[in-house]
Swiss-Prot record:
Entry GO MF terms: GTP binding; GTPase activity
Organism annotation: Mus musculus (Mouse)
Names of the cofactor(s): Mg(2+)
Placement of sequence motif Switch 2: 113-132
Family: Belongs to the small GTPase superfamily. Rab family.
Protein name as it appears in the record: Ras-related protein Rab-36
Gene: Rab36
Amino acid sequence: MRSSWTPLGPPVSQDRIITSFPKWYTPDACLQLKEHFHSRVSTACQHRNTGTAGLRLSKVVVVGDLYVGKTSLIHRLCKNVFDHDYKATIGVDFEIERFEIAGIPYSLQIWDTAGQEKFKCIASAYYRGAQVIITAFDLTDVQTLEHTRQWLEDVLRENEAGSCFIFLVGTKKDLLSGAACEQAEAEAVHLANEMQAEYWSVSAKTGENVKAFFSRVAALAFEQSVLQDLEKRPSTQSQVGDGDGDLIRIEVPKTQENKRPPGLGCC
């Protein structure tokens, strides 16, 4: 019998449904150049055999200097608004954004951290367990780009080496054009390669590239979750959910399904 999942929570919005592997922003600084999901992931999704991928949230940590637009970026994604009356984040805040990837429910838990030095000790406690690190800077302020090195070091100090996807994101793209934008992006791409990060330019004000960027983040995190689950999967599977009522029912092999404890027979 083919396994299936039954969504019981609110439906995912249409622009959060991902059916094909999202493309990079620039091939000069991207984590993966491929254009399709891993074949094992595609097969698992087709058979709704993705294990705990629908159960887990991927933790995304967003860091960067004060006023680079971290909160505005997150609000554009989650609320589709741009805040003209900006208030600095105090400590940390987070949003949960639901996606459907190759037919499977999946969520990002996006942590918005304060850019002020005085809140660093508070925010650092929330860096642990990140699957994705987004280091944001202002495309119009080269100093904020230089500071991303330290922000990345701070987050990596709380996580295992090689365990996180790293993104370098230039904000306020709407304020630059032509040669000025090309120059700023060239410098950022150079740094992204040093960081082993994928680079994106976005605008929270206009919404340019915001949905595409987070779709890319979600797809990479989802694929990694499924592959990790396939590697450590036990012989018997069961039904799992994502905490919001989305269920994934995993098929149990017949050799296990039909086995009875000794001494038990049919009534």
